Amino acid sequence: MAAMAAIPPQRYHYFLVLDFEATCDKPQIHPQEIIEFPILKLNGQTMEIESTFHMYVQPAVHPQLTPFCTELTGIIQGMVDGQPSLQQVLERVDEWMAKEGLLDPSVKSIFVTCGDWDLKVMLPGQCQYLGLPVADYFKQWINLKKESVLRLPGELSDPRGWTPLLFAPKPEACPFHGSAPSPLGGAMSDLTWTLRRYC
Protein backbone atom coordinates (compact mmCIF):
# COMPACT_ATOMS: atom_id res chain seq x y z
CA MET A 1 0.00 0.00 0.00
CA ALA A 2 1.36 3.41 -0.90
CA ALA A 3 2.32 5.58 2.02
CA MET A 4 3.09 9.23 2.58
CA ALA A 5 6.55 9.78 4.09
CA ALA A 6 7.62 12.55 6.45
CA ILE A 7 10.71 14.74 5.97
CA PRO A 8 13.46 13.62 8.37
CA PRO A 9 16.45 15.99 8.33
CA GLN A 10 19.15 14.99 5.82
CA ARG A 11 17.66 11.56 5.20
CA TYR A 12 17.29 11.94 1.45
CA HIS A 13 20.01 12.59 -1.09
CA TYR A 14 17.47 13.88 -3.60
CA PHE A 15 13.94 15.26 -3.66
CA LEU A 16 12.00 14.67 -6.89
CA VAL A 17 9.38 17.40 -7.24
CA LEU A 18 6.44 16.24 -9.34
CA ASP A 19 3.16 17.84 -10.42
CA PHE A 20 1.04 16.23 -13.14
CA GLU A 21 -1.38 17.97 -15.46
CA ALA A 22 -4.28 15.84 -16.65
CA THR A 23 -7.28 15.94 -18.95
CA CYS A 24 -10.28 17.59 -17.33
CA ASP A 25 -13.62 19.21 -17.99
CA LYS A 26 -16.71 20.45 -16.19
CA PRO A 27 -18.37 18.10 -15.32
CA GLN A 28 -15.30 15.91 -14.87
CA ILE A 29 -14.43 13.41 -17.60
CA HIS A 30 -13.52 9.79 -16.86
CA PRO A 31 -10.96 8.50 -16.99
CA GLN A 32 -8.63 11.43 -16.53
CA GLU A 33 -5.31 11.05 -18.35
CA ILE A 34 -1.91 12.55 -17.59
CA ILE A 35 -0.91 15.04 -20.30
CA GLU A 36 2.21 16.56 -18.71
CA PHE A 37 4.85 14.67 -16.73
CA PRO A 38 7.44 17.02 -15.12
CA ILE A 39 10.06 16.14 -12.49
CA LEU A 40 12.67 18.38 -10.84
CA LYS A 41 15.62 16.65 -9.19
CA LEU A 42 16.73 18.68 -6.15
CA ASN A 43 19.93 17.95 -4.24
CA GLY A 44 18.92 17.14 -0.66
CA GLN A 45 21.89 19.02 0.80
CA THR A 46 22.11 22.14 -1.36
CA MET A 47 18.44 22.21 -2.52
CA GLU A 48 19.72 23.15 -5.97
CA ILE A 49 18.05 21.78 -9.10
CA GLU A 50 20.45 19.26 -10.65
CA SER A 51 18.31 17.86 -13.44
CA THR A 52 14.83 18.01 -14.95
CA PHE A 53 12.58 15.56 -16.73
CA HIS A 54 9.72 16.92 -18.79
CA MET A 55 7.47 15.30 -21.37
CA TYR A 56 3.98 15.86 -22.69
CA VAL A 57 1.77 12.78 -23.00
CA GLN A 58 -0.72 11.93 -25.76
CA PRO A 59 -4.07 11.09 -24.13
CA ALA A 60 -5.64 7.95 -25.58
CA VAL A 61 -9.22 7.82 -24.33
CA HIS A 62 -9.99 11.53 -24.71
CA PRO A 63 -7.39 12.68 -27.27
CA GLN A 64 -9.05 16.07 -27.81
CA LEU A 65 -8.39 18.57 -25.01
CA THR A 66 -11.40 20.55 -23.86
CA PRO A 67 -11.38 24.37 -23.73
CA PHE A 68 -11.74 24.06 -19.94
CA CYS A 69 -8.61 21.89 -19.77
CA THR A 70 -6.58 24.30 -21.90
CA GLU A 71 -7.69 27.28 -19.81
CA LEU A 72 -6.89 25.49 -16.54
CA THR A 73 -3.53 23.97 -17.51
CA GLY A 74 -2.23 26.25 -20.24
CA ILE A 75 -1.67 23.18 -22.42
CA ILE A 76 -2.97 23.42 -25.99
CA GLN A 77 -3.80 20.60 -28.39
CA GLY A 78 -0.60 20.95 -30.38
CA MET A 79 1.48 20.24 -27.27
CA VAL A 80 0.05 16.73 -26.86
CA ASP A 81 -0.66 15.69 -30.46
CA GLY A 82 1.90 13.14 -31.61
CA GLN A 83 3.52 12.88 -28.18
CA PRO A 84 4.45 9.52 -26.59
CA SER A 85 1.88 7.41 -24.78
CA LEU A 86 1.94 7.13 -20.99
CA GLN A 87 3.63 3.73 -21.29
CA GLN A 88 6.41 5.24 -23.40
CA VAL A 89 6.80 8.20 -21.04
CA LEU A 90 7.07 5.89 -18.04
CA GLU A 91 9.84 4.01 -19.86
CA ARG A 92 11.63 7.34 -20.43
CA VAL A 93 11.21 8.21 -16.74
CA ASP A 94 12.86 4.92 -15.81
CA GLU A 95 15.73 5.63 -18.20
CA TRP A 96 16.13 9.12 -16.72
CA MET A 97 16.05 7.75 -13.16
CA ALA A 98 18.79 5.26 -14.08
CA LYS A 99 20.92 7.90 -15.84
CA GLU A 100 20.67 10.19 -12.80
CA GLY A 101 21.77 7.39 -10.46
CA LEU A 102 18.42 7.39 -8.67
CA LEU A 103 17.94 3.61 -9.00
CA ASP A 104 21.16 2.91 -7.08
CA PRO A 105 20.07 1.24 -3.78
CA SER A 106 22.57 3.40 -1.87
CA VAL A 107 20.95 6.62 -3.15
CA LYS A 108 17.95 7.76 -1.10
CA SER A 109 15.43 9.77 -3.10
CA ILE A 110 11.73 10.47 -2.76
CA PHE A 111 9.03 12.19 -4.77
CA VAL A 112 7.49 15.40 -3.43
CA THR A 113 3.96 16.45 -4.38
CA CYS A 114 1.36 18.97 -3.29
CA GLY A 115 -1.35 16.59 -2.16
CA ASP A 116 -1.78 12.86 -2.60
CA TRP A 117 -3.68 13.06 -5.90
CA ASP A 118 -0.69 12.69 -8.27
CA LEU A 119 0.72 9.43 -6.92
CA LYS A 120 -2.15 7.99 -4.87
CA VAL A 121 -4.96 8.57 -7.37
CA MET A 122 -3.92 9.78 -10.83
CA LEU A 123 -0.92 7.64 -11.79
CA PRO A 124 -2.05 4.32 -10.25
CA GLY A 125 -5.60 4.86 -11.52
CA GLN A 126 -4.50 5.45 -15.11
CA CYS A 127 -1.98 2.61 -14.96
CA GLN A 128 -4.69 0.25 -13.71
CA TYR A 129 -7.01 1.37 -16.51
CA LEU A 130 -4.28 0.76 -19.12
CA GLY A 131 -2.94 -2.43 -17.52
CA LEU A 132 0.48 -0.91 -16.80
CA PRO A 133 2.66 -1.64 -13.76
CA VAL A 134 3.53 1.16 -11.33
CA ALA A 135 7.24 1.34 -10.48
CA ASP A 136 8.07 0.99 -6.80
CA TYR A 137 9.68 4.44 -6.65
CA PHE A 138 6.25 5.99 -7.29
CA LYS A 139 4.72 4.24 -4.27
CA GLN A 140 6.15 6.49 -1.56
CA TRP A 141 6.12 10.27 -1.54
CA ILE A 142 6.07 13.39 0.61
CA ASN A 143 2.79 15.29 0.52
CA LEU A 144 4.19 18.76 1.11
CA LYS A 145 0.73 20.21 1.70
CA LYS A 146 0.11 17.79 4.57
CA GLU A 147 3.69 18.09 5.80
CA SER A 148 3.38 21.87 5.98
CA VAL A 149 0.31 21.53 8.20
CA LEU A 150 2.26 19.26 10.55
CA ARG A 151 5.20 21.65 10.65
CA LEU A 152 3.08 24.78 11.09
CA PRO A 153 0.56 23.85 13.83
CA GLY A 154 -1.75 26.67 14.81
CA GLU A 155 -1.61 28.46 11.45
CA LEU A 156 -4.84 28.83 9.54
CA SER A 157 -5.04 26.96 6.27
CA ASP A 158 -5.88 28.57 2.98
CA PRO A 159 -9.49 27.85 1.86
CA ARG A 160 -8.14 25.52 -0.82
CA GLY A 161 -6.38 23.44 1.83
CA TRP A 162 -2.88 24.89 1.34
CA THR A 163 -1.11 26.49 4.28
CA PRO A 164 0.02 30.13 4.12
CA LEU A 165 3.63 29.01 3.60
CA LEU A 166 2.81 27.66 0.16
CA PHE A 167 1.18 30.98 -0.75
CA ALA A 168 3.73 33.25 0.90
CA PRO A 169 5.26 35.96 -1.33
CA LYS A 170 8.17 34.51 -3.23
CA PRO A 171 11.27 36.43 -4.26
CA GLU A 172 11.40 37.26 -7.95
CA ALA A 173 14.67 35.34 -8.19
CA CYS A 174 12.89 32.11 -7.26
CA PRO A 175 13.38 29.60 -10.12
CA PHE A 176 10.20 29.03 -12.15
CA HIS A 177 8.41 31.81 -10.21
CA GLY A 178 5.75 33.29 -12.44
CA SER A 179 2.26 32.88 -13.74
CA ALA A 180 2.83 30.40 -16.57
CA PRO A 181 1.28 27.06 -15.53
CA SER A 182 3.39 24.94 -17.85
CA PRO A 183 6.05 23.69 -18.24
CA LEU A 184 7.69 23.45 -14.83
CA GLY A 185 5.79 26.41 -13.44
CA GLY A 186 2.88 27.09 -11.11
CA ALA A 187 2.70 24.43 -8.42
CA MET A 188 6.19 23.16 -9.33
CA SER A 189 7.57 26.58 -8.44
CA ASP A 190 5.61 26.70 -5.19
CA LEU A 191 6.68 23.17 -4.24
CA THR A 192 10.35 23.86 -4.94
CA TRP A 193 10.34 27.15 -3.05
CA THR A 194 8.50 25.66 -0.07
CA LEU A 195 10.78 22.63 0.07
CA ARG A 196 13.78 24.95 0.21
CA ARG A 197 12.18 26.82 3.09
CA TYR A 198 11.77 23.59 5.05
CA CYS A 199 15.21 22.09 4.56
What kind of region is each of these model predictions?
Residues 81-95:
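Glycine-rich, highly charged phosphate/nucleotide-binding loops
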Residues 1-20:
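N-terminal accessory regions of nucleic-acid-interacting proteins
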